[in-house]
């Protein structure tokens, strides 16, 4: 069986590597991928994510059994609909189902309609009305661009002035283009955040281990928001009862609601949750695997990944098993300056061997050379599975200390929250 993974980052590297390790899978193509993936025997296809017709033509020519769609913008642009219209299978939600991610206002409407716990909110396209709402509610308060903004469209404002400025940047200054033409303004929720992922087909879903991401650029959760600087799974200090509550009060009603709305969901659903004094509440939905969480969740899967996905798509009950001991922890290495301006072309250390997996996010071969250079904001991620968070930290940070990371940076405190508890 030949498979296609659409996307280019560390998430897609982890998905493609796991698929290639499955029985019955002979070849995995990644479009467009990045050069670091070739070190794991993956085949790159020079077609960008937005070129749906070229991807479909490639899939037909190469007798691809099905495609796994990685990035949010492809799903929001209807790539799954296009594959299905061409008679091809793709694992991911249709454009209508993916609206859970590409419109925060739509997600809020679904949650309100199906009684799913989330923050109180208002949606505005008029700046003066948004400003009046902010002044009425007070701070802290959260301002979100309605559409996709590369994970950077959320401002947690400590003051009313900050919130008004964020709303102005989105609504008047066009900071995120059409994505910020509407804003969702939410009450600030206090508590610890965690991620819950599920494989989904309609109202059938299969929960994955919990994960905790680290969004801020620098140690101590300082600095700007990023796509994510590291993660670990499972979250050892999170009681199973909280997960069970989240499944019954959030995941199940949302998926049943989507079926009732005529938008049945197929693919991976990410639920960003916060554990408040009133129990778990939804911060956001993503209509696909998270990055970097994929890179620490998939190494824990002990069943046949390709078979699992194939079964889920066919409506067959999958046999999914997970490693149930130890902790998988990963640290992202990014270009200095990320998530703002950064340089490309920094030489990268050699790929790790043994127990530490290297997933590449932004890597490119130097011309006529096997030397990998940085080619993005997040560059690579080191991942290991150990008995504890502490043991995972020791392993990864010892390895990083031995690598030449000139021109790159990483956080030194990934997993600390689990140790403090």
Swiss-Prot record:
Q: Identify the gene encoding this protein.
A: purD
List cofactor names only: Mg(2+); Mn(2+)
Domain ATP-grasp per the UniProt entry, residue ranges:
108-314
Q: Where does ATP bind?
A: 134-195
Q: Which reaction does it catalyse?
A: 5-phospho-beta-D-ribosylamine + glycine + ATP = N(1)-(5-phospho-beta-D-ribosyl)glycinamide + ADP + phosphate + H(+)
Looking up PROSITE patterns in the UniProt record yields:
ATP_GRASP (PS50975), GARS (PS00184)
Give the UniProt family note.
Belongs to the GARS family.
From the Swiss-Prot or TrEMBL record, give the protein name. Answer: Phosphoribosylamine--glycine ligase
Q: Which GO terms describe its molecular function?
A: ATP binding; metal ion binding; phosphoribosylamine-glycine ligase activity
HAMAP family associated with the record: GARS (MF_00138)
What are the disulfide bonds?
A: none
- Supply the source organism for this entry: Streptococcus pyogenes serotype M6 (strain ATCC BAA-946 / MGAS10394)
One Gene Ontology biological process: 'de novo' IMP biosynthetic process
List the keywords (alphabetical): ATP-binding, Ligase, Magnesium, Manganese, Metal-binding, Nucleotide-binding, Purine biosynthesis
The UniProt annotation places Mg(2+) binding at: 284, 286
Q: How is the cofactor bound?
A: Binds 1 Mg(2+) or Mn(2+) ion per subunit.
Give the pathway annotation. Answer: Purine metabolism; IMP biosynthesis via de novo pathway; N(1)-(5-phospho-D-ribosyl)glycinamide from 5-phospho-alpha-D-ribose 1-diphosphate: step 2/2
């Amino acid at each position: 069986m030949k498979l296609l993974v659409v996307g280019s980052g560390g998430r897609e590297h982890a998905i493609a590597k796991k698929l290639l390790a499955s029985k019955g899978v002979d070849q995995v193509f990644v479009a467009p991928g990045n050069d670091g993936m070739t070190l794991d025997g993956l085949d790159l296809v020079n077609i960008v994510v937005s070129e749906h017709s070229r991807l479909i033509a490639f899939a037909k020519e190469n007798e691809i059994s099905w495609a796994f769609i990685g990035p949010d913008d492809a799903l929001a642009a209807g790539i799954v609909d296009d594959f299905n219209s061409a008679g091809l299978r793709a694992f991911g939600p249709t454009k209508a189902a993916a609206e859970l991610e590409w419109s925060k206002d739509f997600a809020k409407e679904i949650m309100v309609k199906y009684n799913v716990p989330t923050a109180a909110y208002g949606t505005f396209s008029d700046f003066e009305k948004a400003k009046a709402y902010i002044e009425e509610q007070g701070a802290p308060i959260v301002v979100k661009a309605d559409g996709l903004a590369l994970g950077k469209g959320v401002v947690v404002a400590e003051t009313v002035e900050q919130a008004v400025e964020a709303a102005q940047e989105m609504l008047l200054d066009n900071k995120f283009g059409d994505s910020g033409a509407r804003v969702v303004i939410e009450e600030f929720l206090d508590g610890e955040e965690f991620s819950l992922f599920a494989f989904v087909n309609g109202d059938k879903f299969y929960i994955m281990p919990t994960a905790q991401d680290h969004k801020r650029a620098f140690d101590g959760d300082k600095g700007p928001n990023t796509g994510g600087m590291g993660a670990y799974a499972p979250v050892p200090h999170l009681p199973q009862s909280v997960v069970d509550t989240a499944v019954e009060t959030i995941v199940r009603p949302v998926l049943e609601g989507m079926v009732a709305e005529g938008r049945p969901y197929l693919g991976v659903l990410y639920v960003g949750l916060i554990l408040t004094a009133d129990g778990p509440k939804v911060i956001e939905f993503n209509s696909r695997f998270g990055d970097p969480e994929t890179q620490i969740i998939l190494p824990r899967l002990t069943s046949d990944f390709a078979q699992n996905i194939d079964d889920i798509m066919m409506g067959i009950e999958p046999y999914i098993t997970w490693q149930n001991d130890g902790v998988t922890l990963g640290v992202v290495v990014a270009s200095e300056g990320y998530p703002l301006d950064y340089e490309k072309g920094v030489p990268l250390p050699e790929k790790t061997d043994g127990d530490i997996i290297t997933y590449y996010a932004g890597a490119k071969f130097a011309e006529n050379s096997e030397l990998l250079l940085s080619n993005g904001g997040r560059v690579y991620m080191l991942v290991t599975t150990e008995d504890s968070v502490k043991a995972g930290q020791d392993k990864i940070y010892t390895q990083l200390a031995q690598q030449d990371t000139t021109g790159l940076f990483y956080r030194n405190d990934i997993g600390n929250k689990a140790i403090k508890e």
